[in-house]
């Protein structure tokens, strides 16, 4: 038995808020897990401190599956983003500990490497099409084989995915939600022009992706997918609200553009219909919000039965702890598709020293025992929590809409 004697929650804001769980065993071995829920961080802090940490003390850190089931099945109020994010933090930390005890990187404990590295995609964005293309050219020069393109929409003051003042993209930047204006018609008119220009400049030897961010109806998404077919996107992401699973059937019937969804999914039930009916090509569920490595491995295995690949969320709303965990997961599964990689700020990287590295369009998790990531608690303490909310959208007539 490897008894857990301490578990503490650390909140830090090196440019944005992150929540980290650190578990310590009686032998002095520590493991870290990410518990960040973007814009709702303190809800997970409370859930961990009030409901999970007391039940962790005294348990055997080796019993990862049993502890996972204890917190999931043992709770009548199972599931949901807060509980599953908290559970993911516990799961990551326990896998980190198990790897350190074994003296092996976690991917070796998950069955070993299925590939030499994890192919990632970067984010190129700009206020105009030409700004976006210029950024994409830089990513291609850095070795990226896949790039997500987002650009400002003419007639709209702000657009999802476009950074402010050329800084790292961070939508949750105000004490209270910023209200933005959205126009589907203007958006649908602009996106095909972006990808037409992208293919002219970038050529056909790089994968291109786009994120709609849940803002279309199924028929609108079908029309967009059809319009984008000539440019052979790797995927069209979150084209309709993720809970509208039946809507993907209509989209699928009208376009061959590959579809991706799932970064807000918490468990397999959220994606069951999409996977079984092969209504999507890529599942975007993440280690952070789907209950950790233990649960996501099961979801990926189910997806593999139906020829659906993974494409895990990897924006900066998750810390380098999740990024490391995602890479070990990605290395170990047969149906890996692509991994999102949005670079963290230097301040964040300093707080979370990590072993993973980027080269030739791929991330490599490294071979340090465990997850290969840690938290500098002294440095983290110098960056106190700062409340920040995600924006909200209204239509041009004032109607509240999806962000």
UniProtKB/Swiss-Prot annotation:
InterPro entries: D-mannonate_dehydratase_GalD (IPR053379), DgoD-like (IPR034593), Enolase-like_C_sf (IPR036849), Enolase-like_N (IPR029017), Enolase_C-like (IPR029065), MAND (IPR034587), Mandel_Rmase/mucon_lact_enz_CS (IPR018110), Mandelate_racemase_C (IPR013342). It is an enzyme of class 4 (lyase). One of its GO terms (biological process) is carbohydrate catabolic process. Its EC number is 4.2.1.8. Pathway: Carbohydrate metabolism; pentose and glucuronate interconversion. Its cofactor is Mg(2+). The active site is at residues 160, 213. Substrate binds at residues 38, 123, 263, 284, 313, 317, 340. The record marks 315 as: Important for activity and substrate specificity. One of its GO terms (molecular function) is magnesium ion binding. Binds 1 Mg(2+) ion per subunit. Keywords: Carbohydrate metabolism, Lyase, Magnesium, Metal-binding. It catalyses: D-mannonate = 2-dehydro-3-deoxy-D-gluconate + H2O. Mg(2+) binds at residues 211, 237, 263. Belongs to the mandelate racemase/muconate lactonizing enzyme family. GalD subfamily. Catalyzes the dehydration of D-mannonate. Has no detectable activity with a panel of 70 other acid sugars (in vitro). This is D-mannonate dehydratase CC0532. It comes from Caulobacter vibrioides (strain ATCC 19089 / CIP 103742 / CB 15).
């Amino acid at each position: 038995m490897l008894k857990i004697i301490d578990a503490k929650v650390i909140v830090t804001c090196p440019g944005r808020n992150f929540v980290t769980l650190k578990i310590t065993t009686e032998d002095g071995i520590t493991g870290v897990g990410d518990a960040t829920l973007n814009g709702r961080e303190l809800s997970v802090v409370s859930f961990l401190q009030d409901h999970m940490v007391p039940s962790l003390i005294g348990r055997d850190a080796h019993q990862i599956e049993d502890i996972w089931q204890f917190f999931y099945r043992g709770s009548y109020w199972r599931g949901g983003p807060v509980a599953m994010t908290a559970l993911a933090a516990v799961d990551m930390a326990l896998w980190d500990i198990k790897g350190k005890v074994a003296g092996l990187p976690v991917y070796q404990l998950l069955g070993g490497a299925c590939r030499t590295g994890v192919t990632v995609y970067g984010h190129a964005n700009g206020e105009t099409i030409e700004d976006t293309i210029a950024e994409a050219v830089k990513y291609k020069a850095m070795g990226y084989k896949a790039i997500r393109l987002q650009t400002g929409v003419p007639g709209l003051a702000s657009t999802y995915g476009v950074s402010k003042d050329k800084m790292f993209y961070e939508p949750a930047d105000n004490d209270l939600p910023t209200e933005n204006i959205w126009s589907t018609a203007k958006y649908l008119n602009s996106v095909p022009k972006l990808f037409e220009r992208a293919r002219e400049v970038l050529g056909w030897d790089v994968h291109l992706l786009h994120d709609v961010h849940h803002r279309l109806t199924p028929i609108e998404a079908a029309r967009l997918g059809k319009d984008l077919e000539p440019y052979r996107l790797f995927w069209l992401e979150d084209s309709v609200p993720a809970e509208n699973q039946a809507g993907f059937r209509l989209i699928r019937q009208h376009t061959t553009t590959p579809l991706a969804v799932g970064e807000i999914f918490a468990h397999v039930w959220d994606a069951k219909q999409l996977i079984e009916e092969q209504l999507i090509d890529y599942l975007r569920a993440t280690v952070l919000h789907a209950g950790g490595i233990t649960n996501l491995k099961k979801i990926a295995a189910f997806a593999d039965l139906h020829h659906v690949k993974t494409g895990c969320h990897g924006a900066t709303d998750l810390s380098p702890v999740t990024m490391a965990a995602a890479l070990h997961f990605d290395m170990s599964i047969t149906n890996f598709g692509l991994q999102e990689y949005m670079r963290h700020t230097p301040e964040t990287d300093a707080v979370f020293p990590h072993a993973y590295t980027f080269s030739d369009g791929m991330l490599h998790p490294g071979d340090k025992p465990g997850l290969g990531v840690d938290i500098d608690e002294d440095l983290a303490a110098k960056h106190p929590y700062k409340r920040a909310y995600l924006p909200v959208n209204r239509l041009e007539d004032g109607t509240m809409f999806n962000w």
